[in-house]
């Protein structure tokens, strides 16, 4: 069954959003009478029947709804510096949603090479990944946020940052799936020494993500995978 995203599944009759309707009509060529799945990204999944399909619009009647609790007992928040190439950051967002993440914050640091992001595009990537992986919760994606703003925000009990210098403990040695976690990943070139000192002052723990030097997006996904798997044990 094809899945579509619609933010409000309370009414019995649903008109698909424009982009979703275009996909249903022009790409999938769905017709009246076919059944579809609907996700609101907030834990509700519905089965619906298409009752009207025109050149530009799709109307569906809700047949059933199911509510799903949050997928993890503890939240995973990734704050990740944008990559120089936008497609790499989009790939990270796509895979993080598939693996399982609750919030993504594009992080501005001293060495961040990209000062602008199309958040609407990242949100579309996240929606597509949610549908592909058949998840029912869509992660929050923030606007570009400074390091100072992220670390000053009241947040998770566990606070980590990836660090390549010295011999910090591995993330998997410190992370506990019992409480929320915030993981910071710097840009290529890593955080500056001054930023690392600032993070230590705010009680962030430096962690290693392995012996190899990883790209920003690879490091972020490595951390996401470790934490997600730890919660499934």
State where each predicted segment sits:
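Glycine- and other small-residue-rich loops at beta-strand/loop junctions that grip anionic moieties
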Residues: 81, 115, 188, 212, ...
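N-terminal positively charged helical leader segments and presequences
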Residues: 1-68, 120
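Structured adenosyl-cofactor binding patch, chiefly the S-adenosyl-L-methionine
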Residues: 193-233
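Fold-independent oxyanion-binding glycine-rich loops
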Residues: 7-8, 18-19, 41-42, 81-82, ...
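Generic structural signal for residues in well-ordered beta-strands
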Residues: 60, 138-142, 206
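RNA substrate-binding interface of SAM-dependent RNA methyltransferases
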Residues: 65, 69-161
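Active-site/ligand-binding-proximal alpha/beta "capping" segment
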Residues: 159-198, 202-209
């Amino acid at each position: 069954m094809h899945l579509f995203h619609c933010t409000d599944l309370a009414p019995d009759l649903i008109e698909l959003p424009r982009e979703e309707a275009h996909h249903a009509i022009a790409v999938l060529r769905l017709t009246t009478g076919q059944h579809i799945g609907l996700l609101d990204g907030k834990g509700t999944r519905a089965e619906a029947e298409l009752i009207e399909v025109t050149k530009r619009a799709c109307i569906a009647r809700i047949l059933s709804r199911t509510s799903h609790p949050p997928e993890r007992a503890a939240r995973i928040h990734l704050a990740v510096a944008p990559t120089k190439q936008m497609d790499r950051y989009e790939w990270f967002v796509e895979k993080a949603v598939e693996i399982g993440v609750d919030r993504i914050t594009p992080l501005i640091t001293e060495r961040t090479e990209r000062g602008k992001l199309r958040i609407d595009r990242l949100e579309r990537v996240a929606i597509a990944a949610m549908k592909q992986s058949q998840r029912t919760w869509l992660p929050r994606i923030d606007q570009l946020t400074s390091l100072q703003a992220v670390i000053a925000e009241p947040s998770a009990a566990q606070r980590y940052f990836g660090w390549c210098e010295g011999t910090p403990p591995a993330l998997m040695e410190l992370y506990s799936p019992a409480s929320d976690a915030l993981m910071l990943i710097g840009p290529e070139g890593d955080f500056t020494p001054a930023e690392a000192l600032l993070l230590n002052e705010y009680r962030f723990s430096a962690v290693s993500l392995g012996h190899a030097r990883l790209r920003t997006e690879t490091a972020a996904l490595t951390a996401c995978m470790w934490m997600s798997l730890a919660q499934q044990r």
